[in-house]
Amino acid sequence: MAYSKGVSGTLSDYTHLRTLPALLSVVFVIAGLYQFGGISDVTITWLSNYTLTSTHAMGASIGAYALAFASSETKQFDNYQDFEKVLIAAGPAVILGYEYIQPVTDLINTTSNAGPIAAFVVTVVAWGVAVR
């Protein structure tokens, strides 16, 4: 993207940024880190020290994923190759499976951090493919 000179040109350049997908990306990554254990504890002190749960993180992740995919320029599955379709489906499957299906949770929660890190990477890659 070529950058314009001057204040009005710079302002125009910033209006072309896709701020909603960028904001959703931040929400998605932070929620994923929290859900898979990369962030240990989130407490909102303004709400009488209310602590967020992994269910909140799952809801934020799925909500951000759905909004971003719906606003994507290539949201029709015909626009994706087969391996991309698998990745797009794998993201929400891992997020929801980790929360609601005990065998998936057990598979991801290994004795090391490898399982949660791999699950997080799968969801972020799925995000990248879905919102391209």
Curated annotation (Swiss-Prot):
Keyword Translocase annotated: no
Coiled-coil boundaries: none
Membrane topology reported for the UniProt record: Peripheral membrane protein
Compartments where located: Virion membrane
Keywords (A to Z) from UniProt: Membrane, Virion
GO cellular component, one term: virion membrane
Membrane keyword on record: yes
Protein name: Matrix protein
Natural source organism: Halorubrum pleomorphic virus 1 (HRPV-1)
